[in-house]
């Protein structure tokens, strides 16, 4: 049996059903189909503008939405299954966060970007943006994986999605920065938000659960499923909301080449940093993806294919170095217990991506972009800014993202420390049997091991 504090029989149904009821009410009051998904509105447009059904944005955006959706539910979910006793929770809590997050983010982002005549108008692009927002929360989830209850994760999602919407609106609409692939708004914000939450929730006696924090052979194979899905679909992630035509085409190409170069750099550095020249599966699962993060801001810009490769190579190197040397320092010196190493996959590569975006913006000229300047840098195109000013605003956007992450993560961390949310004890972390019915007698055996603080690897 589980302890009283971690028993979810009342807490989880209360929070899930109450928040779902509130969300339904808010959708009923505010959310409506946009003109491309509304029966009357779309057919009026067909009649008035000589359009055809093939012009509906659904047919342009849905393939990208499918890919992003797979990344959110399969890619992120399975990437976190490396923990040997936490596979159920990794996949299923990812599922829970995403299911609630996409609904709540539809409301929050709708108020900022799709609010007209007192209503939020949603379409295919709204769904993509909702998934993007959810992605930031899942990145934060990686930092606290195994150390939080499902109720804590729901509360974190509720607040973080709200802060994400405000942060994104300030960066894109007030600062006027470009960040189609989310190096700043998604990866940097999500990573440092999660790291600060983890710092506030620091566990003095986590050593009692360290024996379950590692992986086994089959759990690493499951995690590689997530890696491969993320790697294949990352070009869609970065290009999903860019302008049709050359912008989307260019973003896919830049991400494609950055990921490829990043993968080679990851394999090379992983072997180089091992005394016996062996590869570390943690590096391959994670650092090989950093190339997608590194071109999130600059992907739609004229980065050039070789520039994308340079970005990917740098990201792979930085990420591997982070896993090898920086993660232990964060734990021992700064008391930041980063379960998935999100600082190395999302945090540092996100900052790198923001810096690359600012540098590329600095060299934006009419000779390079021609008439395409209006799509990529509209404020430069209309004369509101120079390229140098746009570059400085790109740096400012990075500071805004970091500020929201640090302040928001601190506030949420202290909220989650309240004892009412069913958090596991230091000896119960990274264990499915605390919250799940585990098949056979394995669950009862593992609970006994946890309660007695024994090493499960020594059990018969």
UniProtKB/Swiss-Prot annotation:
Key words of the record: Ammonia transport, Cell membrane, Cytoplasmic vesicle, Glycoprotein, Membrane, Transmembrane, Transmembrane helix, Transport
Topology relative to the membrane: Multi-pass membrane protein
SUPFAM superfamilies to which the protein is assigned, alphabetical: Ammonium transporter
Places the protein is found: Basolateral cell membrane; Cytoplasmic vesicle membrane
Chain ranges on the Extracellular side, renumbered to this chain: 32-62, 109-125, 172-179, 242-252, 305, 369-394
GO molecular function: ammonium channel activity
Protein name: Ammonium transporter Rh type B-B
Species this chain originates from: Xenopus laevis
């Amino acid at each position: 049996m589980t302890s009283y504090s971690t028993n979810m029989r009342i807490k989880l149904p209360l929070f899930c059903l109450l928040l779902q009821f509130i969300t339904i009410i808010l959708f009923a009051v505010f959310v409506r189909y946009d003109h491309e998904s509304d029966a009357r509105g779309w057919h009026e447009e067909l009649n008035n503008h000589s359009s055809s059904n093939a012009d509906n944005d659904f047919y342009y955006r849905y393939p990208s939405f499918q890919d992003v959706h797979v990344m959110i539910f399969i890619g992120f979910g399975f990437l976190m299954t490396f923990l040997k006793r936490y596979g159920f929770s990794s996949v299923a809590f990812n599922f829970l966060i995403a299911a609630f997050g996409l609904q709540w983010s539809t409301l929050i982002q709708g108020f900022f970007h799709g609010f007209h005549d007192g209503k939020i108008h949603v379409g295919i692009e709204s769904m993509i943006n909702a998934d993007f927002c959810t992605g930031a929360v899942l990145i934060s989830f990686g930092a606290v994986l195994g150390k939080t209850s499902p109720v804590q994760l729901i509360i974190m999602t509720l607040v973080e999605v709200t802060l994400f919407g405000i942060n994104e609106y300030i960066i894109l609409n007030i600062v006027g920065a470009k960040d189609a692939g989310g190096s700043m708004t998604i990866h940097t914000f999500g990573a440092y938000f999660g790291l600060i939450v983890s710092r506030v929730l620091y566990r003095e006696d986590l050593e009692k659960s360290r024996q379950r924090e590692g992986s086994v052979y089959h759990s690493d194979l499951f995690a590689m499923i997530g890696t491969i899905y993320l790697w294949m679909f990352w070009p869609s992630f970065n290009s999903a909301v860019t302008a049709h035509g050359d912008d989307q085409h260019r973003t896919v190409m830049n991400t494609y080449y950055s990921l490829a170069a990043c993968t080679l750099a990851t394999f090379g550095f992983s072997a180089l940093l091992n005394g016996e020249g062996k590869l570390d599966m943690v590096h391959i699962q994670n650092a090989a993806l950093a190339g997608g993060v590194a071109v999130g801001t600059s992907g739609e810009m004229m980065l050039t294919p070789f520039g994308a490769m340079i970005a990917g190579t740098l990201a792979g190197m930085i990420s591997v170095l982070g896993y090898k040397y920086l993660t232990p320092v964060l734990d021992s010196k700064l008391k930041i217990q980063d379960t998935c190493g999100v600082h190395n996959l999302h945090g540092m590569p996100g900052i790198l991506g923001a810096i690359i975006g600012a540098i590329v913006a600095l060299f934006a000229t009419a000779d390079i972009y021609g008439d395409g300047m209006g799509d990529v840098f509209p404020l430069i195109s209309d004369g509101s800014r120079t390229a140098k000013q746009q570059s400085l605003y790109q740096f400012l956007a990075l500071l805004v993202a970091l500020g929201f992450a640090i302040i928001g993560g601190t506030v949420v961390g202290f909220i989650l420390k309240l004892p009412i949310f069913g958090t596991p004890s230091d000896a119960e972390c990274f264990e499915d049997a605390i919250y799940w019915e585990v098949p056979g007698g394995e669950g009862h055996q593992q609970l006994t091991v946890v309660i007695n603080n024994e090493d499960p690897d020594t059990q018969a």
